[in-house]
Amino acid sequence: MKPNIHPDYHQIYVVMTDGTKYTTRSTWGKEGDTLNLDIDPTTHPAWIGGSQTLVDRGGRVSKFKNRFGNLGV
């Protein structure tokens, strides 16, 4: 491999929605940072076969519905 062109690959902590915390290696963040998940394999409808619930982070879904909700599709 060429030197000095690859991102830093380090240890981080991942916290799932139920509070479970595990350690993995990633290029995300810095060494020792914590990544808090909003959706994970224990809550995602595709993996649990549950109903379609939508998490609206930052109001994007609400903004879209306000803008295009009257199209009647």
From Swiss-Prot:
UniProt xrefs under HAMAP family: Ribosomal_bL31_1 (MF_00501)
Domain of life, source organism: Bacteria
GO cellular component: a single term: ribosome
UniProt keyword terms in alphabetical order: Ribonucleoprotein, Ribosomal protein, RNA-binding, rRNA-binding
Function: Binds the 23S rRNA.
Alphabetized Pfam families for the sequence: Ribosomal_L31
Protein name: Large ribosomal subunit protein bL31
Subunit structure: Part of the 50S ribosomal subunit.
GO BP of this protein: translation
InterPro entries: Ribosomal_bL28/bL31-like_sf (IPR034704), Ribosomal_bL31 (IPR002150), Ribosomal_bL31_A (IPR027491), Ribosomal_bL31_sf (IPR042105)
GO MF, one example: rRNA binding
KW Ribosomal protein (keyword) present: yes
Family: Belongs to the bacterial ribosomal protein bL31 family. Type A subfamily.
